[in-house]
């Protein structure tokens, strides 16, 4: 018995010691306690709810904030559920899906207090508004936080969940009447408001919050800048848009078509998918049935916006007008921004068998069917075949790379110029970058998402098991500079910090004499480049971005591209 008592005492003592070692945050004003975990040399707080269950009668509706009672203890040691979505085979059974998914994770340096007031970086994940969640190890910012500490400008990182697909972007007349469109963007806004109101208890500064995202995450940052036409106060101070800020198709019919297909597949069509009866039927379905209908009707491919069919809606409320109109009228939050693209951002979406000008024209017409033949011909003239290489070894023609460059500029490159120019006119600094290095070199170049492993200083998370990819010393060095430049931007509103291991000379893009500067990140010619510098060592100048983007950003092209 004595031996048993000793063992039990030892177990209880060990358990108490482990519990005592766990990081804890006490919000004294609200009398709420959060218990987290130590992970990879930082402290993390997982699965913190910021919005109530979005299922049942709350489906498609704007989120409702969670307000814990005074004296609450929140166990933030386990991840919360992810929002309904199509899972990869390897993730099935490992992740909990629920409409009660509005939660966020926080990562911070060790041994902090509420008096520290660190800058805050908030990730909005990408994934085509179809997949994504805050448990994805690719978005883990443990190394980013540690890099920021080593750089002398420590940050706190936050990763949110938001609704996806039909759950987040349902679009009907009935929903618009009750102001329930753009539910996903409203989820994001609520998470940012939670950060504004609560992050001080974790040692964060609510007046130094940067939102950043890649692909549809970048579009989300853009939409948050445009939210409410800039008439409401914003719960952040800077934004970073990686590989998209706006998106062609937002004012088109991709989402309404997808909505009609889902409603019909779910047997909720009563003659009109826009009706209140159809909406009531969709709200009565269980999560699995509605998700199955969405998966069964999901359309991918170039002729379906490369899979981006669930898009923000011009609802007259969150987005009071078309994004291009809001930008042109300068109805947006004039915050400091950083926007960029990867050198060969969309190459993997282009058909490899394109070998002629007709093939180029047909591809553009398939992607953007409302662009006139006249304007497609103008694009072909602006991007002559002989300005592009061919890769005989890979079997890729000049017209393949020509198509990829036109497509990249339409989707990724020219919209930052549009937004940045108007933001600069409102006194908001804009920084442009072109990403020019990858951990996985190929004939396709520096692809969509190539920047992410470096920004998060998390190269291994982007290498599939069994892959022959081996990052080089240059890759690891770039990951230090990139991650520290992103966190430096969050701390100082500038990505370069003299005397620190950040990008050197990364200055704002609109400065004087009508020049436009782009920082080339990575590759053999890293550094600031003028888009009009056509010298032999200029990476950007030879791309004729001023002339080409002036056409792509013209009112006629914007109308035909539907944004």
From Swiss-Prot:
One of its GO terms (cellular component) is extracellular region. Keywords: Disulfide bond, Hydrolase, Secreted, Signal. It holds the Pfam family COesterase. GO terms for molecular function: triacylglycerol lipase activity. It comes from the Eukaryota. It is found in: Secreted. Belongs to the type-B carboxylesterase/lipase family. This is Secreted lipase ARB07186/07185. It comes from Arthroderma benhamiae (strain ATCC MYA-4681 / CBS 112371) (Trichophyton mentagrophytes).
